[in-house]
Structures are given as C-alpha cells and as structure tokens.
Amino acid sequence: MAFVAPVSSVFSTSSKSAVCSGRSSFAQFSGLKKVNNTARLQTAEQGSAFGGVSDANDAFFNAVNTMGAPARTSNAPSMKVRVAINGFGRIGRNFIRCWAGRTDSNMDVVCINDTSGVKTASHLLKYDSILGTFDSDVVAGEDSITVDGKTIKVVSNRNPLELPWKEMEIDIVVEATGVFVDAVGAGKHIQAGAKKVLITAPGKGEGVGTFVVGVNDHLYSHDKFDIVSNASCTTNCMAPFMKVLDDEFGVVRGMMTTTHSYTGDQRLLDAGHRDLRRARSAALNIVPTTTGAAKAVALVVPTLAGKLNGIALRVPTPNVSVCDVVMQVSKKTFKEEVNGALLKAANGSMKGIIKYSDEPLVSCDYRGTDESTIIDSSLTMVMGDDMLKVVAWYDNEWGYSQRVVDLGEVMASQWK
C-alpha cells in the first residue's frame, strides 16, 4: 500500500487546477432529451438564463440534463479505470447520473453495493423527487442494473471485507455510505482487493487526503494517496471563494452560517438522535446544529487555519443550501472590488467551480447547478472597508456529486 499523507498535509498554493481550468464545456446526459439549458445561470455579462423566478421550476427538469465535464489531462490511462460504488443513496445515485453524462470519462462503473436490492435501487435511480425522471433506459436484472445498455452488477453486503473487489478487479471504490470515513474503515475496501478509495464525505483522522476540486486537487498523487476524501458539500462551496478572497484581500478571521436543506441524517418526525436538535422533525423546524465545514476549509487552504468557524441551520427544504460568511480582511476594499475579484475567478481560474450571479433568485432556481458555489453578488456587503459579507448558494447534492466525479477523474487520469 502506498504511503498516505495526513489530512493536514494536503493543501493548496494555487487556485488553478489541471482538471478545472477547462471546465467551460458541458456534457450531455446519456440518453436524456436534448434541450436548451434554460435553467442554468449565466455570468453577469451574459445575463440571466430565465426571464423570471416563476419560470425556474418549469425549466429545471428539462435543464438538469447538462453538466460540467472535466478537461482531459495528457496522462490519461489507455484503459478505463474500474469503479465500484459502495452505498447507493443520494450521492451514489447522483454520481451515476453525473458520470453518465461524461462522454469522455476515464472511469467505468461496473458494480454497486446496495442493501436495498436491485428493484429498489433501479427504481430510485430512474425516479427522483429532486431531479425528476432519469430519461435513460434503466432496467433491473436479477443481479444487475442496465442503464442505456450498460450493465452494472449489484451486490449486497454490509461488510466491506466481504465485497468482491478483488475478483472484479476494482480500481476505485466510491465510498458513499457515510459510514467508512476514516483510514481504518475505508481501508477495508483495499483489504478486499480495491486499489483506491474515494470517500464522499469529510474524512476523519490520519491517513485520508482531503481534496476540493479547483482548490488543491492538483496536489493529488497516485503514488502518495490510497484513500482520499472529497470533503463536504459546504466545504466545496466555501473553499473556492474563500481562497479567492484570502489571496486578494487577506482574511484575518471569519464566521459562517450555512442555511442547509435537511438531509437523511435528520428525522422526518420527532425520533431519537444523538443530536437532540436533529431528533426533531426536519419538515417542521429550523434546526441549529454543528458543521465542521468552516474549519475543514483550512485542510485545503492552509492560510485560513484557525481563522474560521460557524454553524448550520437545517431548514425544511429538500435541496439547495446557502452559505453566509462574514469576515475581516487586512486590505481595505469596497463592494465592487470584492465582486470584481469573484467575477474574475468565475470567468478565469475557477471557471466551472465558481458561478457568479447578479439575479434576484431563490433556492429552487439553483437546483441542478453544476458549479460548487454560486456567488449572489447583490448580497455582498462591505462595512467600514475591512469587514465583508459574502453569500454563496450551492446545490448540496448535484454540485457536490459533480465534484466527486471530477475527483474520480483526477485519480483515473494518473492511473498506472
């Protein structure tokens, strides 16, 4: 097994990434109807993609079939890397949809481990309450799911050590259960025969490298990292624009609040939970709770270590969240200069990662957004020339899943 560096050793010195620098093109969903991408946000120069907020819901289900495709790297493998997904929940299924739209992917998804069974897994892939119907041919077999003629084996085992990774010659396991998030747990996939593990959650402890695409993914090394984490959806939202602001203005300290849609970790009705606030009904309450996202930003932007903290407010919406960061900076500035720096990054080094909007939109308008973070420029504030407020939206499922696929492509591009 290759040496795996501690989480804290993985950091960024540049905002540019070989993968994200060309993410201006968009792939088409495999098997989905070709429609104009009317629900995507445009940059400030291009204007709004829809005439008004009332059109957003009508446009969404037709527009969700487009997504950012990563730029190809020069050292792409001659054969596709064999991928298995462990856990077929929200992120696992979103991963399949995102991956299916990549016409030039170096990954080949060959197996899914899901304890709900083939019938349920295929049904939930085909029909989704957030994304709508997956307009591809999804067929449930006896022990497989076929998507537009591509057959993916389905197994069911809760013990990673007993999964058939060796016999199936699995290269990368996308660990999407939310359970095996440390080196010991994720390492069981390697013991079972896989070569690498990509965790779709914040990694815990030593031996897991944390990467945020567009911020520090250029530091990934095939020889150095066996287990990597794609961090959290909120860290993926915060880290890109916080790096831009830190580079440009010098962040002294900051506090963040993410107003976050409810997740499967909460309770539909009041029921037991280790967090007594999360024990309360997600559909009826604003639920204050913890988030490690602010501190985790320092794992990929080390100049921000010890400078950020924050909380989460879980709200009764099923998807899309918004991050509000108030910070003190060392360089005097004003609103237009702050927005200018963010717009420049959105159109340049972080194109496809940061999106910039000057439209008065709401959360539903951002469903299906490919980018990790969408700057709401009209909400930017500057107080006394050194205190900033920046507000950024993010699709905590779809945008995050796009980055999981991107990070998988980074790993696959270095395969030996």
Curated annotation (Swiss-Prot):
Protein name: Glyceraldehyde-3-phosphate dehydrogenase, chloroplastic
Similarity-based family: Belongs to the glyceraldehyde-3-phosphate dehydrogenase family.
Catalytic reactions of this protein: D-glyceraldehyde 3-phosphate + phosphate + NADP(+) = (2R)-3-phospho-glyceroyl phosphate + NADPH + H(+)
Active-site residues annotated for this sequence: C233 (nucleophile)
Subcellular localization: Plastid, Chloroplast
Pfam families hit by this protein: Gp_dh_C, Gp_dh_N
A GO CC term attached to the entry: chloroplast
SS bond partners: none
Site (Activates thiol group during catalysis): H260
SUPFAM superfamilies: Glyceraldehyde-3-phosphate dehydrogenase-like, C-terminal domain, NAD(P)-binding Rossmann-fold domains
Complex formation: Homotetramer.
Binding site for NADP(+): R90, I91, D114, R158, N396
PROSITE patterns from the UniProt entry: GAPDH
